[in-house]
Amino acid sequence: MKKPYRKISDYAIVGGLSALVMVSIVGCKSNADDKPKEQSSLSQSVQKGAFVILEEQKDKSYKVVEEYPSSRTHIIVRDLQGNERVLSNEEIQKLIKEEEAKIDNGTSKLVQPNNGGSNEGSGFGLGSAILGSAAGAILGSYIGNKLFNNPNYQQNAQRTYKSPQAYQRSQNSFSKSAPSASSMGGASKGQSGFFGSSRPTSSPAVSSGTRGFNS
């Protein structure tokens, strides 16, 4: 039986509003966690929900700094001054719709070739950062087929994370909540991003390299 306070130490790195929301999520999940549920893939755990923290960068772009499995999807935006706010469903859907239009006309950062990531304006906006995160696999699932086989998306999805460590923590966190995924052939090399693991027969995509990340 999992204790509702078991992972509080994991959230110590997250401050303010995000920490309070995380604690409430863990408490709400405790009853559900008492009932073991078999999961066949990483995508099943992602579909349950994701807690995502996006951090504003100096170039006004956004990066994923932390994300964990959750019973519901919450997206928190932290600005340069450290102020945090939870995006409303209306805001999220508006951002995703705007990003979908960019994907359709080829102007989304997610589907453009990686030009090195260090040029001015090369960062990701809120919409692309959301779709590159675990939350994007849930909230933007209806446009997943536009991204699934796009090689540029497979590379750029990792770049939406602030560091290789943030990406790896996310992959490990969602993998732990889908224990049966390890029995399905191991991690897939060459695919990254949560849309890349959405096939029922796919296993978690975990990259061992650090290429493509921007700090």
From Swiss-Prot:
Ranges of biased composition (kind: Low complexity): 170-208
Please provide one cellular component term from the Gene Ontology annotations of this protein. plasma membrane
- Which InterPro entries did the record assign? UPF0323
Q: Where in the cell is it found?
A: Cell membrane
Looking up PROSITE patterns in the UniProt record yields:
PROKAR_LIPOPROTEIN
Which parts of this chain are annotated as the region Disordered?
A: 158-215
Q: Which residues form the signal peptide?
A: 1-27
Listed Polar residues bias regions: 158-169
N-palmitoyl cysteine: lipidated where? C28
The organism's superkingdom is given as Bacteria
Annotated lipid attachment (S-diacylglycerol cysteine) = C28
Topology versus the membrane, per the UniProt entry?
Lipid-anchor
Q: Which UniProt keywords apply?
A: Cell membrane, Lipoprotein, Membrane, Palmitate, Signal
Q: NCBIfam families given for it? A: PRK04081.1
Give the family this protein belongs to, as stated in its UniProt record. Belongs to the UPF0323 family.
Q: What is this protein called?
A: UPF0323 lipoprotein HP_0232
Q: What are the top taxonomic ranks of the organism? A: Bacteria, Pseudomonadati, Campylobacterota, Epsilonproteobacteria, Campylobacterales
